[in-house]
From Swiss-Prot:
One of its GO terms (cellular component) is plasma membrane. The keyword Ligase does not apply. SMART domains: AAA. It catalyses: ATP + H2O + 4 H(+)(in) = ADP + phosphate + 5 H(+)(out). Belongs to the ATPase alpha/beta chains family. This is ATP synthase subunit beta 1. It is found in: Cell inner membrane. Residues 471-537 are annotated as: Disordered.
C-alpha cells in the first residue's frame, strides 16, 4: 500500500486535488460516488483513505453521481467516506530511468529497490497512431531462431500469438527473443504480465537478470491477486512505456504480453460488476472494442516499431471461443508449441505444420524464402503421413523416394533445434544466433540431399549448417589415425615366424570379408540413425 500511496503522490503533487466527494455505495470493486460541486470526467483517478484506495471513473450516472472501478483492494472503504479527485487520468513513468526495473499499474517499483524517476509521467490512455504516421512497408522481424524465421516469420510492428501449455518452453522462447532483441538489434524489451502468479513473475525476473538482458528491459505486472481493474489497465500502462521508446527515443520495442486472455477475462469481470448485459458465452458486450483499443496501439511507424508477441490461452481448445476469435483477427503470425515435440527433445518445440504467418508470401519474404518454406513444410507433411506405414511395415517397405523424404525430413527436424543463450547455465551449450540467410542456406542444402550421408545427430542442436560438417571431419580423422596405428610395420612383417601353407599374396580365410556384412552394417547404421533423440538431447 505504501508503494501505491507514494506513486499517486508523485504523479499529482504538482496539481493537488481540490474537488471532493463522498462514497455512496460499495459493491466489490465497483464504488459509486457523489460529487456535489463538480463531477470528475471519465478516466480520472480518485483516491480515498489517505491515498491507499485508488479508483478510476468509468461512468457518469447522473449530474452528481459517478461509478468507479477500484484499482486496489477496497477493504475498509465505507459509505460516507471522503474521496478526492486527482485532476487527471492514471499515469506511469516513462524514460530511460525505467529500464531494468519492475513496476505495477501505478508506476510504483515492486522489485524492492529505490526508484529515482526523472519526473516524466504519461497517461496510460493514448490514442492509436494516425493512419498517416503508420508505415505501410512490411518488414520481417528477425528473431535469430531458425524455425521461426523460416517457417513463420514475424512482422516488424505486428502481433504474433504464442500458443502453448505449461512445460513446453513458452517462457524460454520468450526469454530468448528478449535476449536477441537486446543484444543483436539494440532495442528495448517490455514484458507485461497480466494475471501472472507472483511466483512466475519473480522467477522470470531472476532469469532475466541472470541472463544479462535486464538492463534494456522493463517489466510490468498486474498480478493474479489484484483487482480486475488493475489487471485490465496494466496492458495500457505497458503500451504507454513502449510508445515512449518508439516515438521519443526512436527505438524498436519488443512487447511481450502474458496472457492476453487474462486481459479479456479482467474486462469481463469489470463488465459483470457494472451490470452490463453479457454477450455470447458470458463475455462483455464491448469485447471487440476493448481489445482493439489495446491492439491498435501496437503499430509500425516511421520513427520506430512496437512488435508484440502475445501468449494466448484458448479455453477448452475451442478456437471458436469469442476471446480467441477476436484475438486472431489482430494477429499476423501464429506460433504453436507442441508438447509431443518437447517430449521428443526438439527445442524450441514449435510445431512447423500448425504454425503460420501472413507474411509467408513471395511478395513479402521473397521467392527464394517462400519456395524453401513451402518445400520444408511439404516434406515434413509427407513424413508425418508415412509414420504409420513405417510403424506397421518398417522402413524397408518404402520406395527409394519415400526413404529419401523420411531421411531429409528427420534431418530438417533436428536442424531446426537450436541452443539458446538463456539456457546456457542449464544445458552447458553455448547459445546460437542464426541469421535468416544462414537458416535458408541450411534448409536448401538439406533438401538437395547434401547431408543424406551424415548422421542425424550431427544436425541436432547446432547453429548454422556448416557446424554439422565438423563432427564428421573429426570422426574421419580419428578413424584414419586408428587405422594407421593398427597397420603392421615393416619389421613386424619381416620377422621370422611359422610358415603358412598359403602363398604370400593370398588372403587368409579368417580375414576374408563376409559378403553379407556390408549390407547388414549399412542397414544397422540406417536403423540406428532413425532412432528418436532422447529428452534434452
Amino acid at each position: 500500500m505504501s508503494n501505491v500511496s507514494t506513486s499517486v503522490t508523485a504523479q499529482y503533487q504538482l496539481n493537488p486535488a481540490q474537488n471532493t466527494g463522498l462514497v455512496a455505495a460499495v459493491r466489490g470493486s465497483i464504488v459509486d460516488l457523489i460529487f456535489e460541486q463538480h463531477v470528475p470526467p471519465i478516466h480520472n483517478v480518485l483516491y480515498a483513505q489517505n491515498k491507499h484506495v485508488v479508483l478510476e471513473v468509468v461512468a457518469q450516472l447522473s449530474a452528481q453521481k459517478i461509478r468507479t472501478i477500484a484499482l486496489t483492494a477496497t477493504q475498509g472503504l465505507a459509505r460516507g467516506m471522503p474521496v478526492e479527485d486527482s485532476g487527471g487520468p492514471l499515469k506511469v513513468p516513462v524514460g530511460p530511468s525505467t529500464l531494468s526495473r519492475m513496476f505495477n499499474v501505478f508506476g510504483a517499483p515492486i522489485d524492492g529497490h529505490t526508484y529515482q524517476h526523472d519526473g516524466k509521467w504519461r497517461s496510460v490512455h493514448q490514442a492509436p497512431p494516425a493512419l498517416t504516421k503508420i508505415s505501410s512497408q512490411l518488414q520481417i522481424f528477425e528473431t535469430g531462431i531458425k524455425i521461426v524465421d523460416v517457417l513463420c516469420p514475424l512482422e516488424r510492428g505486428g502481433k504474433a500469438g504464442l500458443f502453448g501449455g505449461a512445460g513446453v518452453g513458452k517462457t524460454v522462447l520468450l526469454s530468448e527473443m528478449i535476449h536477441n532483441m537486446v543484444s543483436q538489434q539494440q532495442g528495448v524489451s517490455i514484458f507485461c504480465g497480466i494475471g501472472e502468479r507472483c511466483r512466475e513473475g519473480e522467477e522470470l525476473y531472476r532469469e532475466m537478470k541472470e541472463a544479462g538482458v535486464l538492463d534494456n528491459m522493463v517489466m510490468l505486472f498486474g498480478q493474479m491477486n489484484e483487482p480486475p481493474g488493475s489487471r485490465f489497465r496494466i496492458g495500457h500502462a505497458a503500451l504507454t512505456m513502449a510508445e515512449y521508446f518508439r516515438d521519443d527515443e526512436k527505438k524498436d520495442v519488443l512487447l511481450l504480453i502474458d496472457n492476453i486472455f487474462r486481459f479479456i477475462q479482467a474486462g469481463s469481470e469489470v463488465s459483470g460488476l457494472m451490470g452490463q448485459m453479457p454477450s455470447r458465452m458470458g463475455y462483455q458486450p464491448t469485447l471487440g472494442t476493448e481489445l482493439a483499443g489495446l491492439e491498435e496501439r501496437i503499430a509500425n511507424t516511421e520513427d520506430g516499431a512496437v512488435t508484440s508477441i502475445q501468449a494466448v490461452y484458448v479455453p477448452a481448445d475451442d478456437f471458436t471461443d469469442p476471446a480467441a476469435v477476436h484475438t486472431f483477427s489482430h494477429l499476423s503470425a501464429t506460433l504453436v508449441l507442441s508438447r509431443k515435440r518437447a517430449s521428443e527433445g526438439f527445442y524450441p518445440a514449435v510445431d512447423p505444420l500448425q504454425s503460420s504467418s501472413k507474411l509467408a508470401t513471395p511478395t513479402v519474404v521473397g521467392q527464394r524464402h517462400y519456395d524453401v518454406a513451402r518445400q520444408v513444410k511439404q516434406i515434413l507433411a509427407q513424413y508425418n503421413e508415412l509414420k504409420d506405414i513405417i510403424a506397421m511395415l518398417g522402413l524397408e517397405q518404402l520406395s527409394k523416394k519415400d526413404r529419401d523424404v523420411v531421411s531429409r525430413a528427420r534431418r530438417l527436424e533436428r536442424f531446426f533445434t537450436q541452443p539458446f543463450f538463456t539456457t546456457e547455465q542449464f544445458t552447458s551449450m553455448k547459445g546460437k544466433f542464426v541469421s535468416l540467410e544462414q537458416a535458408l542456406t541450411g534448409c536448401e542444402r538439406i533438401l538437395q540431399g547434401e547431408f543424406d550421408d551424415y548422421p542425424e545427430s550431427a544436425l541436432y542442436m547446432i547453429g548454422e549448417i556448416d557446424e554439422a560438417i565438423k563432427p564428421k571431419q573429426s570422426a574421419t580423422e580419428k578413424n584414419s589415425s586408428m587405422n594407421s596405428d593398427l597397420k603392421p610395420s615393416n619389421s613386424e612383417s619381416n620377422s621370422p615366424g611359422p610358415k603358412n601353407s598359403e602363398p604370400d599374396n593370398a588372403i587368409p580365410s579368417s580375414a576374408k570379408p563376409n559378403v553379407s556384412q556390408p549390407n547388414t552394417f549399412k542397414q544397422d547404421a540406417q536403423n540406428e540413425s532413425l532412432e528418436e533423440p532422447q529428452n534434452g538431447r
